[in-house]
């Protein structure tokens, strides 16, 4: 019997993780994250890796574990890693949940004919809401990233800790969220080694800039998405 593949995808802040966790609990299936940046464990906050408490005991796996200095895994490599993981899991699981928002990876899957033979698909695309609703959710997420609970690291801590290694600079400058913080610091001549000390007004400005960046990225993802091919067998058609 072919493995059942649930594909949950959509833009950042649209609730993919919550949906995948709920489905994992009801189906008893593991989740494989399709987010290429989440492969970098040093970027857990900025990439939106869910915490253990958010996972509610469900199983979640990343495409690989990678240091920031090596750069974000390419879409082509991520596609092959995912193919390998699905092939391995298919021997022991009846269902798998593929969740994420990397349109580059999803488009690489769409272009790869091998996915037509991998299993039965159930597709759940989360649409981008209107700008007001999206920005409200994005602001909430960014605010939590900039002001984490006591004792927990935030995105500023991640950036400050990684910036001491020059080989990380170009990688961080190319990732949503970190990019805006770096631009802000450069414009105001704030050393990154002191970025965790910025005042509430600076954080409020960053919340708006990063939320806007997320919105623009979400629109770009919608434009770039190629569309699921008819050759992917739907579970309802099996």
Swiss-Prot record:
GO molecular function, one term: AMP dimethylallyltransferase activity
EC number: 2.5.1.27
Top-rank taxon: Bacteria
GO biological process terms, semicolon-separated: cytokinin biosynthetic process
Reaction it catalyzes: dimethylallyl diphosphate + AMP = N(6)-(dimethylallyl)adenosine 5'-phosphate + diphosphate
Keywords assigned: Cytokinin biosynthesis, Plasmid, Transferase
Enzyme class: transferase
SUPFAM superfamilies on file: P-loop containing nucleoside triphosphate hydrolases
Function of the molecule: Transfers dimethylallyl groups to AMP as part of the biosynthesis of cytokinin phytohormones.
Family: Belongs to the isopentenyl transferase family.
Official protein name in the record: Adenylate dimethylallyltransferase
Naturally occurring in which organism (per UniProt): Ralstonia nicotianae (strain ATCC BAA-1114 / GMI1000) (Ralstonia solanacearum)
